[in-house]
Amino acid sequence: MDRGPLLKVEGVSKHFGGVKAVDNVSFEVNAGEVVGIIGDNGAGKSTLIKMISGVYVPDEGKIWFDGKETEGKSPREMREMRLETIYQDLALADNLDASSNIFLGREKLKNRVFKTVDRGRMMDGARDTLKTLAFQLPNLKRLTRDLSGGQRQGVAIARAMHWNARFLIMDEPTAAVGVAGRRNIYKLVGDLREKGVPVVYVTPNVREAFSIVDRAVVIRRGRKVVERMVKETTVDEIVGFIVGSRKAEE
């Protein structure tokens, strides 16, 4: 039986003072689908996904996840619903090592009465998850601030995937990684698609989006200007919508 979209965003808007960062945006994401949110820097992409993940509360509009309205839910509550987000700034604690970041706020405990953290189990869990994702991190005890951009991205992705995400949002995940890191990320997205886990993939790179997403939602100046299946459009057409030289047909 068709359960409908796992994520439904309906008419959401967000203001910061007199600036309308997101203006009446709607879209849906179905199981096993990779949807690209595409637009230039400053278009409102990150603000949009932060409303979905619970960081911001929409000023207008509604969001549903798995058939439930998410109004008032915090990022922690969204994670408990297994919607995981990898933010553009990665949201890592630089003074902690990889395993502590992966388990941050969800630490493994030796003793639930005295709240003693089980560092060994956390280290083993972090190592296994990073290995599964094919991210190389020679020293799990190194502080996150001392890691390369690709290694930091690997920790952020491992933090999301360790908890068996049902839905993953990735905000410009390849911005600070090299070629090998990009390959790992593209493979992860493909593997999630095969498992039926939907992905919202945020990027300003149209060619990158065309290589991995099923459907493109173009955001320009806070508004959704067009939505296209990538197999039914071209890179040039989508670029035209991004820069404003093309208009969606009414």
Kindly label every feature range from the protein language model.
Residues 2-250:
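Glycine-rich phosphate-binding loops of nucleotide-dependent enzymes
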